[in-house]
UniProtKB/Swiss-Prot annotation:
Pfam families: Myosin_head, Myosin_N, Myosin_tail_1. Residues 85-780 form the Myosin motor domain. The modification Phosphoserine is found at S417, S1090, S1139, S1271, S1309, S1512. The modification N6,N6,N6-trimethyllysine is found at K129. It comes from Mesocricetus auratus (Golden hamster). It comes from the Eukaryota. This is Myosin-6. Residues 1925-1939 have a biased composition (Basic and acidic residues). Muscle contraction. Muscle myosin is a hexameric protein that consists of 2 heavy chain subunits (MHC), 2 alkali light chain subunits (MLC) and 2 regulatory light chain subunits (MLC-2). The lineage of its organism: Eukaryota, Metazoa, Chordata, Craniata, Vertebrata. The gene is MYH6. Residues 842-1939 form a coiled coil. Residues 657-679, 759-773 are annotated as: Actin-binding. Residues 32-81 form the Myosin N-terminal SH3-like domain.
Amino acid sequence: MTDSQMADFGAAAEYLRKSEKERLEAQTRPFDIRTECFVPDDKEEFVKAKIVSREGGKVTAETENGKTVTVKEDQVMQQNPPKFDKIEDMAMLTFLHEPAVLYNLKERYAAWMIYTYSGLFCVTVNPYKWLPVYNAEVVAAYRGKKRSEAPAHIFSISDNAYQYMLTDRENQSILITGESGAGKTVNTKRVIQYFASIAAIGDRSKKDNPNANKGTLEDQIIQANPALEAFGNAKTVRNDNSSRFGKFIRIHFGATGKLASADIETYLLEKSRVIFQLKAERNYHIFYQILSNKKPELLDMLLVTNNPYDYAFVSQGEVSVASIDDSEELLATDSAFDVLGFTAEEKAGVYKLTGAIMHYGNMKFKQKQREEQAEPDGTEDADKSAYLMGLNSADLLKGLCHPRVKVGNEYVTKGQSVQQVYYSIGALGKSVYEKMFNWMVTRINATLETKQPRQYFIGVLDIAGFEIFDFNSFEQLCINFTNEKLQQFFNHHMFVLEQEEYKKEGIEWEFIDFGMDLQACIDLIEKPMGIMSILEEECMFPKATDMTFKAKLYDNHLGKSNNFQKPRNVKGKQEAHFSLVHYAGTVDYNILGWLEKNKDPLNETVVGLYQKSSLKLMATLFSTYASADAGDSGKGKGGKKKGSSFQTVSALHRENLNKLMTNLRTTHPHFVRCIIPNERKAPGVMDNPLVMHQLRCNGVLEGIRICRKGFPNRILYGDFRQRYRILNPAAIPEGQFIDSRKGAEKLLSSLDIDHNQYKFGHTKVFFKAGLLGLLEEMRDERLSRIITRIQAQARGQLMRIEFKKMVERRDALLVIQWNIRAFMGVKNWPWMKLYFKIKPLLKSAETEKEMANMKEEFGRVKESLEKSEARRKELEEKMVSLLQEKNDLQFQVQAEQDNLNDAEERCDQLIKNKIQLEAKVKEMTERLEDEEEMNAELTSKKRKLEDECSELKKDIDDLELTLAKVEKEKHATENKVKNLTEEMAGLDEIIAKLTKEKKALQEAHQQALDDLQAEEDKVNTLTKSKVKLEQQVDDLEGSLEQEKKVRMDLERAKRKLEGDLNVTQESIMDLENDKLQLEEKLKKKEFDISQQNSKIEDEQALALQLQKKLKENQARIEELEEELEAERTARAKVEKLRSDLTRELEEISERLEEAGGATSVQIEMNKKREAEFQKMRRDLEEATLQHEATAAALRKKHADSVAELGEQIDNLQRVKQKLEKEKSEFKLELDDVTSNMEQIIKAKANLEKVSRTLEDQANEYRVKLEESQRSLNDFTTQRAKLQTENGELARQLEEKEALISQLTRGKLSYTQQMEDLKRQLEEEGKAKNALAHALQSARHDCDLLREQYEEEMEAKAELQRVLSKANSEVAQWRTKYETDAIQRTEELEEAKKKLAQRLQDAEEAVEAVNAKCSSLEKTKHRLQNEIEDLMVDVERSNAAAAALDKKQRNFDKILAEWKQKYEESQSELESSQKEARSLSTELFKLKNAYEESLEHLETFKRENKNLQEEISDLTEQLGEGGKNVHELEKVRKQLEVEKMELQSALEEAEASLEHEEGKILRAQLEFNQIKAEIERKLAEKDEEMEQAKRNHLRVVDSLQTSLDAETRSRNEALRVKKKMEGDLNEMEIQLSQANRIASEAQKHLKNAQAHLKDTQLQLDDALHANDDLKENIAIVERRNTLLQAELEELRAVVEQTERSRKLAEQELIETSERVQLLHSQNTSLINQKKKMEADLTQLQTEVEEAVQECRNAEEKAKKAITDAAMMAEELKKEQDTSAHLERMKKNMEQTIKDLQHRLDEAEQIALKGGKKQLQKLEARVRELENELEAEQKRNAESVKGMRKSERRIKELTYQTEEDKKNLVRLQDLVDKLQLKVKAYKRQAEEAEEQANTNLSKFRKVQHELDEAEERADIAESQVNKLRAKSRDIGAKQKMHDEE
């Protein structure tokens, strides 16, 4: 809104919105979005700062105060651009977070703008001073404005609610919440003031309001506030006028929006304030108003003084308030009573009860001498209070001091102590005040209840907000529970609106119901077995205390609900007993006094006096209270309530809250959140921490959180294109037309931003949070670049202009200089001098001629001037006239514009009316269809009823007999019900016993698990338990010494007591008793010590067993170490031999190169080499023999792997024999064919290929052998597993059979009970069938009536057809008229366009446009008048609605066309005005054309008149048609009245019949439900038993599988070890490679151990889940002996797994460090066992930690074993590759031998063959060298194979990650099982509740059966009446048809 529009708000404008100047200044303020930020602050929550630097996740910033702070990067929050300063709707902030919201509120509050929107919220801050924003001028300015059209205000919220109610036909509500002192009451008053002012402008008379003795309804609604505030408001620390109750005010409106009535509901009145106030607070205002002495007659009537300090109940705090004038407030309260219609008697009663409460507080009592009973200490105040209450003073005192109490069936008088009497007085005073306040509310509602018709309402909820105090009690729980429900309601509503916005805009969005976020907390409070339920249950038990209530809360919710927590008590604060996690924060609650507060007990003797009071008001207040004797019968029969007195406070609050939520769910809500800025009541000061606390509590930040989930920023396409086109102008070209949406899409797609951060709707573009700020930053950067460029170009242009001027000056100076120099050169010439003299003479003659010419010219100019002056005057006159005409035309255009605006508004209203009518038409059609269906049903039922009418008369006698039988059966069923209740009570007791047994079994099971874990801990807790046990032993020794000292002290005390025996006998007795007790304690201690000693001896024996096992393991380890040493030495030897061989090969190659020299030397060297080679071969054979010896020794130890290795050796030998045969063949070929050496080489190459293939085949055979061996091992393990499983399952089968026998016995008893109940239900069903038969006969009569009604409806349809024909004729006339008018107006438009082209002048165009607009306006007015008439017809006639709807759409199109044409004419007007300015000089020439145009205009006016005459004729014809319509309408109205009467009568009869039928059906359904529920409950019990059995079996199976896994892993480890020992021979040759593999394996082992640490947490969670599953075993396990047996088995399993774990770790790590560590751990365990004389309680606490560590170690061992198996497989693969390489090496060695042999032969041949042969040998040597290189390449390939194995290890790590995922899946499965367990528990609870409800329903049904007969008689009489009435109506209808 502009400043001119804001002027409508008057003086309030500056307090509502920033001016345009301020907005411009804010937008031009320098701002850097990258550095401006908020940082957290200890005092101020957040402060503004500028970022100085960033490094390492830390940000250094400088605050506004100059302070430098360093914070984490995620704690820094960006500031919003200046565009968003003091923004009205905080949801539009681009950076929407806590500091942005806080500072926006703070800056607006500093400018006194106290109202701010936050999405759906309106946040208001208390200004603590008067602001001119509520006067009548502001009310008028806000009326009818949309929320976006006006500044934020409570009036805007109110008006929107009012407008929504009128347009949407939906009830509205305004929810105002906040802390005390935040301004809730003031805003509530303003809302009511607004509604009273805008909705009551019409009729202010009192004729429709008979209850209004004084004042109108509006006055009464406004005056209800002062009356309620006097009795419900009080001064508190924060607020002088704090409402101490919540209220929901419903203001009802009629169909037109006028006030109709109002009513008020109140919640949670603070009763305790009546008798107690804090120092800085005071009681309710009414007490001090009475004592203000403004009305002395009141003081005399109430027998009080004017000094508040005379009365204890009202003087505990302050007695006066500076801001409140109690005397004036008394007059306002009294006048409010008068306006609200209170009688004098009612006013006096209210005042008397208020005075009596003050006297109550002054009553004194004292204790009787030598008794604890109380007696009155003076009766003056008691007499006064009794007089004012209309009681007898003596009876009152007697009732207080000696109330009557019922004991059994008799009443006894009970004596009260002084404290009990004072408590009783306080409770009575509070109860009287509360009931009086509730009566006032009821009385005010009766006054505000008028007889005016009401259709909709607007509810205003004023209730306390969320409360988190240091001390939170029952009241805070109720308030916070209420706010939790309201916040859930808001969350759900808010996101529903967001979703509707997204759906309307066509944005894809997945629905999220944020309303469910708070469901867990709400369920915790209100659901069965919730906090409220447990509180009410405890109130039922006489011996219940606050601590038992706390224990039940802990048992049911601690650890089971995340919202229920154990509080952390802080020193200096009051104790808290439990904590609840609400949406606004965690609240600690103190439960002291909750049971008394909830029960709110009263002295029933005094209440009985109240009921008999002579004061009418007092007797009325307590008339509904049921005392003990009145409620006795209800108790005995188990009724629902013990009257109203037994209804607890929590139950009443829940009931009221459910009603409120039901009301709110039927309304469209609006939310107002009030904020208190500071606690000092200082205006303009805002305390940041206080405000942040409230924003969290009242849901503003919660609302922002929800808003941020979607797209909080949204801009219209046009606005976005206009503002951000500058970012990329090329995306939207200037010259061509592009739709705004397409332009926005192109623009955003061209920018470098995340496309998921925005969405395109139908009319708007939606942005995620923060993106708009990024766009603003990009726009600012773009603008700065553009402005910089413009500035540069402008400066350049200016400088170029200046430079051009300088150049021109220089050129001019040069010309002047040249001319002066030329003149100076010729001025002394004689001819020049002569020229100077003659020149003036020549000029004088010329001047004379010029003067004559000038005189002539002057005369001519003078004449022309005179003519021009005359012409100018004429033109001026014409200009004045034209200007006048122009102004007139402008005024006319403005008037036409206003008229057009009015027409548009009326058109909008018509469109709205059309929509409403369409809705009504739909409703009427639906109603018509329903009525037709009902009519059909009624006619059919009518026929049936006529047929059955005769049968009914016969059945009446039968019914009387059946009724007598039913009465007998009723008595029988009552007896059965009693028996059933007794049986149910017995069942409840059985269930309670079962639950106790269940708990006992759970505890026993838990104890057994603890024992099991303790036993496991004794093995696995190493260093930690050692230290702790040593400390415990020291503590025990210290405690033993202390016990000895205590014993010595006691003996000394005993001797001293014996010496003092003569002093006093009483002290001796006491001391002897003490001595006896101490001796008993000592005996107990000694007994405990002996027990612990026996336990220690057992533990020592166990430790000895463990020590033996450790020694065996150590011996085994030593053997393995010796074997390892032997392997290492063998490997060292082989490595040495290999190095020697390689060295020798190198020497051979060198010698072969030198073979070209002397052959004799070479022969000698060859011989030496051969000798050395022989020696090396012998050494190698010896080494192989040694290795074979060691391998044989190992094979003897491990017989399983001998066969496998033997087969492998056989295969290798076969391959070797083949190779040797081939070698011999090669030798023969070499001897035979020495000349063909090349062919031999080729043959050799081929044979080598063959050998390689054979070797591959051999490898394949070996792999197959390994697989078969592996499968054989698997079969053996499976066999062992199946044997163990069979044994275990046999044992479990025996246990389960015993268990099943127990369950079957229980099931038989339950089935017997169920059969009894079934028999009872069948008897009841027979009675029901008899009644159902009677009901069917009544239905037959009803069907006959419905047939009659159908005939009436057919007649009605006939009339409607006649009416529709008339309406169709009207529609034809209207369409004819509209088409003619459209054609004529189009002709006018064409003619005026031709006129405009001919005139080409602005004034003519203006006149043409004006004429056009006037004609359009006239025709439009006529059409609108006709439309209004037709709309009235439409409202009267439902049948013609469809036709009128089509015509209305046509009219809308025509109106849109005219509107478009008018806009075109406006554009033509603007263009013509521009032309008028440029062509004003040509007006004179165009005068003739103007006159011709006037003639044309007159012709068009004549045509217009003809058209108007035709229109008038048509309107007359329409008027005649309308008369006919009116006559038909009258007939239709009469018929409708008769139809409505008949329909209402039929509906009443049908309703009564349906009601009776429903009652009987409900009774039958309830009986069936009871039967089904009992059967379902029994089935569920059976299912629970079966489920528990299955769970137990599942747990046993899981234990068995874990045991099998352990055995498999152990066998696998042993098998791997055997294979490793068997493969040692092959690994000896490749020792270096094996060492490298071993080092890599160690690295992978370390990685696996690190991975084990990572997965340890997940395994812990899985173990916890397993523990939860194990608890289910306790449901079916009845004996502790079974658990002990399982304990023994599990111990054995643990010992086995422990041994396997140690073996696996020892085999994997392969170092002696682990052995030494285990040795030290075992020795420490031996020491620990000796010192296990610890206290049992301390030992149990430490056992839990140790058990956890044991589980971790066990899981770690399992993981390590599996990793070891995987690593062993990998190692086996590497060993296979190394074996392959070894075989290749052997082959190479064999080829070397062959080559050596050939070399020897070659040398011999060389001796014979000479140099040629030597050259051949050299060539052969070169080929061998090439082969050697090839072998080296193969070696490199083997290295590559090793790298592949490394990649395989990486794949194994990936498999471990998959194992992690499997663990996660297991965890999910465990969670699901836990949820199922909880669901089963919940079902059991619901079954118990259902049983209780079924019993109550059973009792209800009996009562309803008694009422069924009476209702059947009533229905029959109504049917007879309806028959007579329908006959009369049929006769009337026939008469009407004949007329």
